[in-house]
């Protein structure tokens, strides 16, 4: 059985970890970095760039460079959060046929799952390069406050990337695993995980207990906001830069897509710098131009100003924290440790707010960028059977229920219920001889069903004719360990289990997933072909170069026919290298190798003659006595 890797699929950055010899290790990507920007670029020649290469070209290709796509996962186009992003993103967010939010690049319409799959493929490849074996299974993390649609979308992204997603786990829970596993003390402790990432905010209260030699991680409560993160902090800085520049220069940069991409990069850099400095300079020469010529941007941003710009965002994290504490049935005094997760928690003002909420300094011994991936890898080792001393008890973040008379949300499974869990409820008909019932399933905390997230409509058909209220229809809600809902129904009067039809109101159909899997496989095959072509070209190029050099130095000692044959083979190979036919390049490389065999022999003979040429010379690698210098040495004691 191969390794089950752990992947933190982040809004801004992603990370992959594996467990080796019982210890988790974060794997560096091909660029040598431990985290990979969650950025995907679709370039003109059809190539797809992922991570740092995509980020580097984003300024010149903003409309086809997709970032923060996690914010669109499992969302409808009409969602207020999506509508807000449409005005901010340089790329096109469009409405799919099923009403979902999709993106468009190079005239191709794509689901967020497809785009996320490109990041997952890079994470998969990173792990494979390190392990030296194929990876097919993974544990992928999601924000604790992700709903059913968003979790299902993440699983689908994994499938498109060629991964069997063994488990979806919540990011704060994964961070708690990373934090608590190496703690040797036997004392039970309650921890709060404050996770402010690139696009989402989560808080979980978790109890770590030692039960019969086993570490038990039990989530007591969770809360959050799936549309609050570092990207929003960046946007506040961008809005401020645009307003300041308009005041100074009278030019509105918000209409300039190329300028906006530069502003985004500058805002992110300024925010990071202000975590350690009190002031930073935002300097963008030639940011735009008008009739009067080019315009340059030069602004000073202080830490105090930044804090005033984002104060409202930081304050928004307090509500979910207080709710989570209340739902967990604990007081702030009961919480032993506060752990910070997510890059945005490096901001001093965020750390001050955490201290204010929980009444204690947050711990700094957890890497906020890597802890989630490490925890996912640990859970992977538990699922593969490599670790048997860890038990994870997670919860469902939002209540599940159905719409009943008057449009009321009747909760069947309340939020913060430990999963997996199952709940059954008996329903009946509202009219005589009613042949079918439609059960609308919702997820959320609002009293009226319509204000919550509609997960789907469950139709039960073929009910035997009877008076209203007589048929007994048992509906069972079953949440698996991934936090994903499954529904079954049974007509209790007949004892038959009737198959329920789930009319998913969003998400990808099985056909769409299969098509995207095939597309991804085709891309992988294309990538392999491209790599093979580059390798063949490099081999051919190296042979052509060395042959030309040898011909210049030793060509005079060849027969005229031999020299002509080599020159003809060189010409053929040069032509083949310009093309894209790998077979032709390989054939011509082989032909040149054969044609230049005699030349190779001449070169070898010349080298050997040169090596033995110097009479009375010292043998290679030895020195004559004349070169040796006698020296006295004295030992020096550094400690004096």
UniProtKB/Swiss-Prot annotation:
Write down the Gene3D superfamilies for this protein, in alphabetical order. 1.20.1270.10, 3.30.420.40, Actin, Chain A, domain 4, Substrate Binding Domain Of DNAk, Chain A, domain 1
The name this protein goes by in its record? Chaperone protein DnaK
The protein's matches in CDD domains, at most eight in alphabetical order, are given as: ASKHA_NBD_HSP70_DnaK-like
Q: In the record, which positions carry Phosphothreonine?
A: 200
Gene that produces this protein: dnaK
The UniProt GO MF terms for this protein read: ATP binding; ATP-dependent protein folding chaperone; unfolded protein binding
Q: What does this protein do?
A: Acts as a chaperone.
Map out region (Disordered) in residue numbers. 608-628
The induction text for this entry reads: By stress conditions e.g. heat shock.
Family stated for the protein in its record: Belongs to the heat shock protein 70 family.
Record keyword Transit peptide present: no
- Give UniProt keywords alphabetically: ATP-binding, Chaperone, Nucleotide-binding, Phosphoprotein, Stress response
This protein's source sits in the domain of life called Bacteria
**NCBIfam families documented for this protein:** PRK00290.1 (NF001413), PRK05183.1 (NF003520), prok_dnaK (TIGR02350)
């Amino acid at each position: 059985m191969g390794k089950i890797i752990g992947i933190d699929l982040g809004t801004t950055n992603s990370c992959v970890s594996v467990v080796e010899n019982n210890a988790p290790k974060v794997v560096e990507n091909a660029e040598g970095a431990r985290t990979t920007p969650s950025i995907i670029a679709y370039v003109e020649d059809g190539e797809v760039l992922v991570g740092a290469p995509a980020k580097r070209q984003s300024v010149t290709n903003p409309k086809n460079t997709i970032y923060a796509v996690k914010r669109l996962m499992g969302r409808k186009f009409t969602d207020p959060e999506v509508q807000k992003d449409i005005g901010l993103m340089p790329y096109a967010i469009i409405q799919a046929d099923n009403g979902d939010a999709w993106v468009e690049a190079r005239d191709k319409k794509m689901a967020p799952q497809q785009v996320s799959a490109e990041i997952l493929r890079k994470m998969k490849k990173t792990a494979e390069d390190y392990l030296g074996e194929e990876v097919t299974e993974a544990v992928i993390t999601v924000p604790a406050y992700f709903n059913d649609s968003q979790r299902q979308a993440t699983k689908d992204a994994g499938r498109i990337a060629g991964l069997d997603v063994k488990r979806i786990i919540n990011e704060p829970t994964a961070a708690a695993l990373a934090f608590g596993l190496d703690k040797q003390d036997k004392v039970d402790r309650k921890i709060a995980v404050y996770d402010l990432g690139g696009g989402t905010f989560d808080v979980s209260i978790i109890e770590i207990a030692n039960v019969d030699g086993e570490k038990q991680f039990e989530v007591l409560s969770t809360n959050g906001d799936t549309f609050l993160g570092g990207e929003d902090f960046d946007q506040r800085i961008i809005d401020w830069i645009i307003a300041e520049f308009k005041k100074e220069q009278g030019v509105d940069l918000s209409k300039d897509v190329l300028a906006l991409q530069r502003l985004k990069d500058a805002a992110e850099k300024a925010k990071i710098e202000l975590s350690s400095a009190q002031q930073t300079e935002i300097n963008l020469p030639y940011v735009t131009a008008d009739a009067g010529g080019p315009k340059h941007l030069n602004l000073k941003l202080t830490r105090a100003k930044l804090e005033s710009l984002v104060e409202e965002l930081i304050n928004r994290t307090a509500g979910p924290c207080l709710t989570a504490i209340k739902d967990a049935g604990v007081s702030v005094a009961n919480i032993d440790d506060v752990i910070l997760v997510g890059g945005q928690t490096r901001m001093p003002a965020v750390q001050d707010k955490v201290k204010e909420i929980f009444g204690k300094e947050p711990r700094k011994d957890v890497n906020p960028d890597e802890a989630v991936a490490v925890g996912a890898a640990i859970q992977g080792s538990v699922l593969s059977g490599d670790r048997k001393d860890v038990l994870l008890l997670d919860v469902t973040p939002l209540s599940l229920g159905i719409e009943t008379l008057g449009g009321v949300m009747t909760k069947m499974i309340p939020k913060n219920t430990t999963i997996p869990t199952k709940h059954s409820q008996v329903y009946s008909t509202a009219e005589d001889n009613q042949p079918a019932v439609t059960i609308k399933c919702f997820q959320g905390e609002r009293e009226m069903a319509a204000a919550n997230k509609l997960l789907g409509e469950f139709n039960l058909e073929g009910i035997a004719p009877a008076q209203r209220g007589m048929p007994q229809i048992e509906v069972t809600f079953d949440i698996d360990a991934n936090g994903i809902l499954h529904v079954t129904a049974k007509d209790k009067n007949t004892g038959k289990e009737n198959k329920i039809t789930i009319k998913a109101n969003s998400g990808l159909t099985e056909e769409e997933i299969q098509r995207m899997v095939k597309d991804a496989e085709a891309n992988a095959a294309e990538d392999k072909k491209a790599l093979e072509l580059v390798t063949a070209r490099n081999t051919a190029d190296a042979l052509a170069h060395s042959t030309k050099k040898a011909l210049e130095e030793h060509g005079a000692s060849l027969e005229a026919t031999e020299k002509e044959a080599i020159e003809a083979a060189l010409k053929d190979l040069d032509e083949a290298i310009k093309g894209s036919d790998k077979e032709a390049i390989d054939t011509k490389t082989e032909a040149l190798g054969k044609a230049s065999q005699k030349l190779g022999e001449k070169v070898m003979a010349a080298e050997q003659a040169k090596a033995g040429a110097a009479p009375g010379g010292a043998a290679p690698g030895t020195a004559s006595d004349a070169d040796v210098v006698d020296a006295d040495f004295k030992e020096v004691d550094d400690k004096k």
